[in-house]
Structure formats: C-alpha cells, structure tokens
C-alpha cells in the first residue's frame, strides 16, 4: 500500500516535472530536438529568467481536476462528481479566456486556485478543451460532446487515481475525460490512467496495474483502439529496440491512446529510474509535454517523491501549491475552516 504523502506528491509533482521537461520540445521533430540538445535529446529542465521550469496546460488542468474532486468530497456523495469537476474546468477556462466572472455564479467561479497568476498564463491550451468548455454543455459517455480523442482528456485525470479505488477511479476517469472528449479512445484512456494510478497506490506493480486497467476497459464499448495501443506499448517495452524507434511505432502522442501508451512504454522500460523514464517519454516527434506528464504521474506514484531528482523538484513552477494539493488529496476531507474556505462551494 502506498497511501502515503511521498507517493501522492510523487504523482502530482512527477507529472508537473514531466510536463515541464517536454514543454520546450512540443511540436518539434526528433531530428530538430537532437540538433538543439544533442544526440540523446533533451535531458534536463529548461528554466526561465527567474530560474523556474514552467508547466503547461496539462498541469494547470490537473490542479483543477484535483480541486474538483476535493470539492465533490465535501458534499459527501450528495452530488454528481463529474459535474463538480466540470465546474472546476470552467474556472480554468475563465483563466485562459480572460473572462470577467464578476456577477457569475459564485459557486462555479469562486476558487482559491484563481489567486495564482501562473494559472492564467497561456501555456498551449488544447483546442478541444477550450471549444468544449466554451459551449457550457457537459459532455458524457452517453451524450458525447464531440468525436475527439485528443490527449487533453487523459493528461489531466491523475488526481482521480489518488482519491478513489480502482473500479471507481476507472469509471470516474472515463466520465471526467468525456466532459470534453467524446471519442471512446478519448475517455477510456482517462479511465485507464486513473485506474493504473489507483492500482499502484494499492501496492500493485506497474504491469499488474496496466492489466487491471485493460480488464476494465474491455467492458466498455469502443475499447479496441485504446487497449490495442496500450498492449502494443507493453510488448515493445520488452523488446530490445532503440526507444525512439519503439515510440515511433506507437505514435506521436497527440491522441489519448498514444499519449498513454508512450507513457506506459517509458514507465515499464525504466521503472526504477524516474529520470531515464521521463527523458525517454518526451524525446519523440509528438506531444512531448503530455507524454512526459503522464509518465511522471505513473512513475511518481510508483517510486515516490524521494526518487525524483531534487534539483528538478526545487525548480518546478508552483511547487508549494503542487505539494499542498497532493497532501489535500491524501487527506480527502477535513473538518476545518481552512478546508471549507478552499473546497466547500458556497
């Protein structure tokens, strides 16, 4: 059992670090990455002029997912959890679109996260997330909001795996991804990642956690593409191939199934070395920040914060907030004025 602060922090900060590692090379081809960073690609965090490694929309949305499920927990089952998470995503959307929320519903737009200037920064927010949230219409598995399988549905759901048992995590991961992504691969991948993290926290090995997630996924309509991509990554992780060649066979990570699979490949290949796994997960032709974030979530939950390079932890943007929300996810609920101010909707 890894229901311990160091594994929760490992998951959340690990994801942010993977996100930051991949950020400078997102949209770049591997050839260009190697020309800029050397034959092994990028292998260290890029710092801004303040000495900070900046996160992207992946970590921004992960924080709002965490806030959403913590708010839902305050309601003690008297709510539809995805709807509470959806309201959290509307808060994130308001930061990205510079919306003046004065006069808006206070329950939706009152949040301590909105005090952090960094969460208003444009860090490459995905078009599907922005378009879906602009409709103010809640997507669901039964009533898909679109046919998108972009990776924006999976890259944000890791906190769900920390809060819920594996069965609930899979279901809720699917539901929360489906808020904005309507293709089966777009939301089943969210369920699988949430389930994998929940299983790891329960004490499973990574390969066991993946098998558990696959078993849940196979009960869903339209599971084939996502499961086949993940199974391909598992197989490739056991082969003696150059990592970049293996990842090229999986894809580029722009779709949810590919992003999850690349992260799974890297986590299995280097399950005892956080740094090597993250470097592997971002050096490819595609969506490097998302594959890095998901890999960081998985391996951070597995290895814990003590096995993440301290020099990376010290420079990650919003480090204190990430640590605090990790601790809150472990606590789940607390009868205190401070807790109610943070997570109880008025």
Q: What is each PLM-predicted segment?
A:
Residues 1-346:
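Structured, active/binding-site neighborhoods that engage oxygen-rich ligands
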